[in-house]
Regions:
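Core SAM-dependent methyltransferase catalytic element
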Residues: 205-236
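Class I SAM-dependent methyltransferase SAM/SAH-binding core
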Residues: 68, 74-119
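A conserved beta-strand element that flanks and buttresses the S-adenosyl-L-methionine
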Residues: 131
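A short glycine-rich, Lys/Arg-flanked "PGG" loop and its adjoining helix->strand segment in the class I
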Residues: 143-155
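Short catalytic micro-motifs in class I SAM-dependent methyltransferases
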Residues: 134-135
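Short alpha-helix
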Residues: 184-199
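Conserved class I S-adenosyl-L-methionine
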Residues: 2-60, 76, 80, 99-102, 160-186, ...
Length: 236
């Protein structure tokens, strides 16, 4: 066998071992197509913002927090976030370029970026809060999304998953839609502790009633911070 033959066979083996790129997420096209008319129902937009104002205390955002809004869409609630956490910073991300283009038109005091939270991410920044509003069911790989969100949170940072509908009504609504979102569901309540735990997050509270789904989880503090109270007690 010639050296050339050996080289070609080695190249073929390496080629076979190379992983195939993941297929594009069809949800991107789904939301891109709907972006221009997403906020046409002005009454629905007003109702959404009014409901968020009512829930502000329960959501728990406070001035000065740096917030990552995941699945910001057209920026429907981004302005509300900016006002709620001012002088904190809001970075709003989405995987739909067309949705982000609509959001940019609003000229809000927020930074809009493209991000696929289910893909490979470089966690160069960390935030006090990651908020997923009307977004989590559309994450094609929910366990991976949670792992990525954990990396994007500071130690002690909070994940908030919020829907202005309970999981039963939301899942029923999605099941009546066409592909690719007809199977986009919120997990059952009993599944959340393990799902979050595998991502390195701890469930703090879960409200799932008619008209509201509100989950809060926390990124555990660093070991040094956990041990600090015991060390202080020992010194006393």
């Amino acid at each position: 066998m010639s050296v050339t033959d050996c080289g070609l066979r080695a190249q073929a083996r390496n080629h076979r071992r190379a992983p195939a790129p993941p297929p594009p997420d069809p949800r991107v096209a789904f939301f891109d197509q709907r972006a221009p008319t997403w906020d046409d129902d002005a009454d629905d937009v007003r109702r959404t913002l009014a409901r968020l104002a009512e829930l502000r205390g329960r959501i728990g955002l406070v001035p000065g927090q740096d917030v990552l809004e995941v699945g910001c869409g057209t920026g429907r609630i981004t302005g509300w976030l900016v006002e709620t956490v001012r002088p904190g910073r809001v970075v709003a991300v989405d995987f739909s370029p067309a949705m982000l283009a609509q959001a940019a038109v609003r000229r809000l005091a927020a930074e809009f970026r493209w991000l696929d939270v289910c893909g490979e991410i470089a966690a160069a920044e960390q935030f006090a809060v990651a908020l997923c509003f009307h977004a989590f069911p559309h994450f094609r790989d929910q366990p991976r999304a949670l792992r990525n969100l954990r990396r994007l949170l500071r130690p002690g940072g909070q994940l908030i998953i919020l829907h202005l509908a309970g999981s039963a009504e939301l899942n029923h609504f999605h099941s009546q839609l066409a592909a690719p979102v007809c199977h986009d569901l919120l997990p059952a309540a009993a599944a959340w502790p393990a799902l979050l735990g595998r991502a390195g997050l701890e469930l703090v509270s879960l409200v799932d009633t008619e008209g509201l789904f509100l989950l809060k989880a926390v990124s555990p503090p660093t070991p040094a911070r956990r041990e600090a109270p015991r060390a202080a007690a020992a010194r006393e």
